[in-house]
Amino acid sequence: MKFRSLIKKTSNWLTATPERSLDNAYKAALKIKEIEDNHFGGKKVSKENADYGDSVISYFKTEVNGYLQKINMGLGVFKTSRLFLNISNIQELPQERPTERELQKNATTAAIIFEKLEFIDQVASKYQSRDTQEVYNGSLVLAKESSQDKETQTLDNKSTNQTNSKLSNNNKISSGQNDSRLESASQKTGVLPRSFINTLNKIKQEIDPKSGESEEQVLNKYRKSRLRTALSIKFILLLIIVPLLTHQLTKTFLLTPIIHQYFQNHEQVVFINKDLEEEAFEELSHYEEILRFQGLIGLREPLTDEEVEEKVQEKAREITEEYRAQGIDSIGNVFADLFSVTAFAIVIVSSRKEIEVLKSFLDEILYGLSDPAKAFLIILFTDMFVGFHSPHGWEVILEGVARHFGLPENQEFNFLFIATFPVILDTVLKYWIFRYLNRISPSAVATYKNMNE
């Protein structure tokens, strides 16, 4: 009874998650609206709409930013939980036609949700839409320029100068001109090291006579970089949390009860493959041998054959329940992983702009590393997955995957996989080093060769 009560409470809490998270976001929007009405005449919280000092404006902006973060988190939880509940409700279609009262209740609930979402969008759009759109546009410009650079790069200095002049003209038009010029430099080929060129660019900016414009550009660059980092981290967490949460919810509340009911209706089904059956027989035989051995050496009173058989039967029941539960868990993992992959694909397909932002964020981090750091990461990756000791690691991974899905271990497949996949991976890595890294950072390749030798 306690377990059923706990399951019911958990189910009710999960069902109420969308409404609860939307209410939190709505309350945060009300707080922002209250600050606007009481101190800024119902307008946006900014210095232009009030006669306060810098300290007061900074205080109100800090409050508004805190409420905006609550709104973003609440809406994120609202969308994610609604997606999970919709997936779960597909399996629970009503058998009878809903009554007029139920339809009216659903319509009222939907109207309230729409009203709250509209109010939240009306309040939050004053503070988020412009900056977010600038980050999206800047990331798209970076992606386009990066692809153009990769297509037009040559070792000839004349071609390099033409590419640089073309990029500088495009940067005058785009809003993120300095960001694009500095970040795309990591993807160009030049005679001088990239770090030396970046240092010269920084000195050039610092001695620029248009100091006021440069300061404004630095502030805009910092704001865009901060927002891009926040969006990238949020998207990475979403890519991790959504599949994991989908796996746990579908497995716990949808798949496990169905599979458990099937095993109850088919009591003759105990093992889902021969390997588990052999493990169970070995465990039972080992238990019987322990009982007889302990009786022979005096660790316990000698047991008669009837007593030994009784204890072995009890152990056999325990083993049956244990391996039946293991089979239920393995079958549930197969279908739960399919749901997780589907959820992951939905997030990827519906987040094109976020992917562009994440790509520019990762490029900035990876290509901004020092040459020894790049060489260290390459050596660590190669030694771990394609090195001398990698076959042992791949064996452990393959055994874990087989046990996760309840599949029997196949030594021939394991040997074939270990003999081919690391070789393919090593070939792809060497091609990447030769094709891209050798042009982007030749010193990193030289450092990698020296460290590898």
UniProtKB/Swiss-Prot annotation:
- Quote the InterPro entries the UniProt record gives: CemA
Q: What parts of the sequence cross the membrane?
A: 235-255, 330-350, 377-397, 413-433
Q: Which GO terms describe its molecular function?
A: proton transmembrane transporter activity
In what ranges is there compositional bias, type Polar residues?
154-163, 176-189
Q: Which UniProt keywords apply?
A: Cell inner membrane, Cell membrane, Hydrogen ion transport, Ion transport, Membrane, Transmembrane, Transmembrane helix, Transport
Q: Where is this region: Disordered?
A: 147-189
Membrane topology type: Multi-pass membrane protein
Low complexity composition-biased segments: 164-175
Task: Kindly list the GO CC terms recorded for this protein.
Answer: plasma membrane
Where mainly located?
A: membrane
Q: Where in the cell is it found?
A: Cell inner membrane
Explain the purpose of this protein. Answer: Required for H(+) efflux immediately after light irradiation to form a rapid H(+) concentration gradient across the thylakoid membranes. Together with PxcL, contributes to transient H(+) uptake following dark to light transition.
Assigned protein family: Belongs to the CemA family.
What is this protein called in UniProt? Proton extrusion protein PxcA
